[in-house]
């Protein structure tokens, strides 16, 4: 019901889960920001990972003249992420990101230009904007976005989570993954075909 109304449904199982959590998002258009803020407030993730294209409704590599609009979007998103109670925030840059603008607005986030391997608790995670960065040597958990050439799945015991398909929440102790569908209109906004006020 919430999904069809433009909100993201948070299950009782997720909300009642007492474990520390990792929130994984990717390719976020500005229309999603208010829902993202709501999710962060409700689930209080200890770790946030964004795998690139922070303002995905602005294809900066295609439309460089929209850099001011992009900059405003980055400012808004970073404010949401960094005002959370998360212990760590990790951001990999996407093909439509500007590293100087992202770094200008971040205070407590770690920004990676390419892929990185990070360890959170007893979980090793490889994070990148691109799924092809994982083909040769995947980690236990592999988080990415960009496109749907590789969907979220488990291959040979390795977990691959595509942040463009779903918002992913990993419970740290059990390693249980909660996948939340994006609201209707998210993909249209990513493609620049959808304009609404949320």
Language model segments and positions:
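Core catalytic region of metal-dependent phosphoesterases/phosphodiesterases
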Residues: 30-115
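Conserved beta-sheet core of the metallophosphoesterase superfamily
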Residues: 116, 120-188, 194-195
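Active-site neighborhood of phospho(di)ester-bond hydrolases with catalytic His/Asp-centered motifs
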Residues: 24-27, 48-53, 90-95, 126-129, ...
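Short, glycine/acidic-enriched loop or turn micro-motifs at the edges of active sites
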Residues: 29-30, 56, 132, 149
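A short, charged/proline- and glycine-enriched loop
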Residues: 16-22
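N-terminal pre-catalytic segment of deacetylase/amide-hydrolase enzymes
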Residues: 1-16
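Structural motif
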Residues: 14, 40, 81, 134-135
């Amino acid at each position: 019901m919430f999904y069809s109304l433009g909100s993201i449904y948070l299950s009782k199982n997720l909300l009642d889960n007492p474990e520390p959590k990792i929130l994984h998002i990717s390719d976020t258009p500005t229309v999603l920001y208010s829902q993202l803020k709501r999710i962060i407030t409700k689930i209080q993730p200890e770790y946030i990972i964004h795998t690139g294209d922070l303002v995905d409704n602005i294809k900066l590599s295609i439309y460089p003249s929209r850099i001011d609009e992009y900059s405003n979007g980055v400012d808004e998103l970073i404010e949401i992420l960094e005002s959370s109670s998360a212990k760590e925030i990790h951001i990999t840059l996407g093909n439509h990101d500007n590293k100087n603008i992202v770094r200008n607005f971040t205070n407590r986030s770690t920004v990676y230009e390419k892929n990185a391997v990070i360890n959170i608790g007893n979980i090793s995670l490889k994070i990148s904007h691109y799924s092809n960065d994982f083909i040769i040597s995947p980690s236990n958990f592999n988080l990415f976005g960009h496109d749907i050439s590789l969907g979220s799945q488990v291959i040979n015991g390795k977990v691959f989570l595509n942040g463009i398909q779903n918002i992913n929440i990993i419970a740290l102790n059990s390693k249980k993954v909660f996948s939340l569908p994006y609201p209707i209109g998210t993909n249209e906004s990513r493609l620049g075909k959808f304009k609404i006020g949320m």
